[in-house]
Amino acid sequence: MSAFKARGVENPSYEDPDEKQKPDLEMSKTNGIGVDNPSYYKNPEKYLGNENEEGKSNNDNEEEEEGEEDQGAVERCVNKFYGGIHNFYKRNKKIIHYTFLGLLLVGYFALVIAACIVNFKQSLALLVLTLIAIFFFFWDLFIAKYGDKIAEALKPCQKFLDNHWSIIRWFVYGALLLAVILWLTLDTAKRGANQVIPFFGLILYILLVFIFSKHPTKVRWRIVIWGLLLQFIFGLIILRTKPGLDAFNWLGIQVQTFLKYTDAGSRFLFGDDFQDHFFAFAVLPIVIFFSTVMSMMYYLGLMQWLILKVGWLMQITMGTSPMESMVSAGNIFVGQTESPLLIRPYLADLTISEMHSVMSSGFATIAGSVLGAYISLGIPAAHLLTASVMSAPAALAISKTFWPETKKSKNSTQTSIKLEKGQENNLVEAASQGASAAVPLVANIAANLIAFLAVLAFINATLSWLGSMFNYPQFSFEIICSYVLMPFAFMMGVNYDDSFLVAELLGMKTFFNEFVAYQRLSEYIHNRESGGPLFVDGVRQYMSVRSEAIATYALCGFANFGSLGIMIGGLSSLAPHRKSDIASCGIRALIAGTIACFSTACIAGVLYIPELYCPNLLMSTLFENGTTVNTTNLMSCCTDLFKSTTMLTPKNITFTEGFNTTMLNGCCTFFPSGFNCSEVRPE
């Protein structure tokens, strides 16, 4: 009891030690300390501090709250303003878009019209591109609105043809055969027999493909006839009509001009003397530039639009499946490994005949990215562009003859195909991605050229060593190819004397790659244009312009053994469970792609008529054969030679356009009155 009293109210000075340890509850309410806030006991320093500091922080908090209130008011006003703009845009989105687009179009058309008024010649390219874009824009609108109605209206005609095609087809085939015979008769009477040989060469190649076909009885001749007909129509428009020839020549010049902009990057990176190492520093950078442009076009959807249009044309005429048509059209613009990506979701469902067709199309054409490189070597751009277009239907025709379809395609309508746009976020990323994607391609080209040229040199050295044992040290890989492949070159319409050189190029392209062959062809072109001697140590140095053109078409494809491995590897990675089917198609697809290129060359041989190139005519006609074929051409060329000759003294004579003293002496023999020939000293 006393102890209790000692600790009770009777002893107010006494402090209970337990009570002493407890904090003031009023303080706990104010400062968040005490039993109501158990974390205080764990970290009391967080809640205890100087009273002055507490007062100061309270003042700061009040000021911050006032600032936050002011800032919140401003933010609310800004948010309200932008919210109003956003809502207005959402309500009038279409009107704003169309208004903005209309203003852009009005400004663009005003620019085009003003440019044409000020300088029509310089504005021609812009005008042509604008008119083409307008035409296809309204064409798409027309088809979108009336396409189904037109198809519905034509259904009775289609039904009638399907029911009576077994009879009608003989009239169609007879009319086509009669037209071909009349064409060849009239053309041969006018041009000579050079155009007849490639026609029979084309028939020979088709017969060979048919004889060795996988299923000869299953060949659909509609595909073959329409494929060849599309080839012929494309070639006729481009090679025989002046508007078509001028258009593709103009297009070739524009492409060459466009590719010249690559020099800016090459000069910056490699210096002003970059062309001293022409192939490495001038040709290969073009591949990077072209790949960049193609990637940008793909991002914008232009490539997909072009591919769909060309693929649609081949599908409705030839009757091939949408998959085959799209890949064949895509190969005009992209490479053999990129074009299958267009139908990547459908690769697993392709029939084996469709797979063979996809591979054949890749072998029969070249990629747009390397097209510029070939042009930079001096290969005529118009011929390369024409060959790229003509080989697309040829690949389908030959491949479907070599391996006909025996099953029904799972994707038989064009509406089942959807070509995706690029996955890049913007145009700059697309350009960067395209440039980066070209780096492995450039490295692959450079590595293959180094390897193949080295291997070719070794093979030639070995063959020369073997040949020297029989007193024939000239024996080489080129000579073997020139004799083995000479009949194929001759049947394309190449002159007999040039067929051995073209056969060499075919061998290089098939066993090495087309870059090696085109590089050698560019040397022949340069030798001819420089007006050098036709023979050096008994070796022919160049060929005729017509033979160069036919060779350009025959070489325009990836059909070589190196590409075979690339094709099988690329397709196998896209469709792993179809690897055995892909491998089984490989060799046949390679042969089909090669013959497709040959058929394109045959069509070119039938249609192509070279412009009169006087230095070549004078060298080959006057001094190789000793007789003239066309006196009118000879006289015209000699007249041009006399006009281009400047004679200061008998020993000081200058020429232009590839002429030389040998040609002058020859022309003086035939037309002595046309020039002061008495002053010319014979060589």
Curated annotation (Swiss-Prot):
One of its GO terms (molecular function) is purine-specific nucleoside:sodium symporter activity. It is a multi-pass membrane protein. The chain crosses the membrane at residues 98-118, 124-144, 169-189, 193-214, 223-242, 280-300, 357-379, 382-403, 439-464, 562-572, 586-608. It catalyses: thymidine(out) + 2 Na(+)(out) = thymidine(in) + 2 Na(+)(in); cytidine(out) + 2 Na(+)(out) = cytidine(in) + 2 Na(+)(in); uridine(out) + 2 Na(+)(out) = uridine(in) + 2 Na(+)(in); adenosine(out) + 2 Na(+)(out) = adenosine(in) + 2 Na(+)(in). The keyword DNA repair does not apply. Its main location: membrane. Residues 119-123, 190-192, 243-279, 380-381, 465-502, 523-561, 609-683 are extracellular. One of its GO terms (biological process) is purine nucleoside transmembrane transport. The keyword Iron-sulfur does not apply. Residues 60-71 have a biased composition (Acidic residues). Keywords: Cell membrane, Membrane, Symport, Transmembrane, Transmembrane helix, Transport. It holds the Pfam family Nucleos_tra2_N. Residues 1-97, 145-168, 215-222, 301-324, 344-356, 404-438, 573-585 are cytoplasmic. GO terms for cellular component: plasma membrane. Residues 325-343, 503-522 dip into the membrane without crossing it. Residues 1-71 are annotated as: Disordered. It is found in: Cell membrane. PANTHER family: SODIUM/NUCLEOSIDE COTRANSPORTER, SOLUTE CARRIER FAMILY 28 MEMBER 3. Homotrimer. Belongs to the concentrative nucleoside transporter (CNT) (TC 2.A.41) family. Sodium-dependent, pyrimidine- and purine-selective. Involved in the homeostasis of endogenous nucleosides. Exhibits the transport characteristics of the nucleoside transport system cib or N3 subtype (N3/cib) (with marked transport of both thymidine and inosine). Employs a 2:1 sodium/nucleoside ratio. Also able to transport gemcitabine, 3'-azido-3'-deoxythymidine (AZT), ribavirin and 3-deazauridine. This is Solute carrier family 28 member 3. The gene is SLC28A3.
